[in-house]
Design a protein with these regions (language model features):
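Non-catalytic interface/targeting segments
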Residues: 1-50, 81-106
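N-terminal active-site wall of soluble small-molecule enzyme domains
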Residues: 52-54
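Mid-chain, well-packed structural core segment of small domains
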Residues: 56-88
Length: 106
């Protein structure tokens, strides 16, 4: 099973892509086998420090294989590398969760 996380500003497919990994409001988990999505609220969005690391720990817990975001901090990168979670960086300010899913399918 392949699960991809897309960082998002909201909890639906029309929400804008959020380029901030640790400070993204939501994480959309897309399951490529079922074409299903599940949204998880980022509980650490307002953490004074360590938001990226805590987000990375959540990704490990969710057993995702890759993450699409705009920026990963050094500590988050280190943890994601340790668990072989692929990090894909895109810088598209106009993308929605749905447009990114559509790109993955093509």
């Amino acid at each position: 099973m392949s699960k991809t996380v897309i960082t998002s500003t909201g909890n639906d497919l029309n929400a804008k892509f959020d380029k901030r990994f640790g400070r993204a409001a939501w994480f959309c988990v897309f399951n490529s086998e079922t074409n299903g999505t599940t949204f998880y609220e980022n509980q650490n969005i307002n953490a004074n420090q360590g938001a990226g690391t805590k987000a990375a720990e959540k990704m490990v817990e969710l057993k995702v294989s890759r993450i699409i975001s705009g920026d990963f901090g050094p500590k988050a990168k280190e943890l994601l590398d340790k668990f072989n979670i692929q990090m894909i960086i895109i810088q598209d300010d106009n993308a929605t969760v749905q447009t990114i899913i559509n790109r993955m399918k093509n």
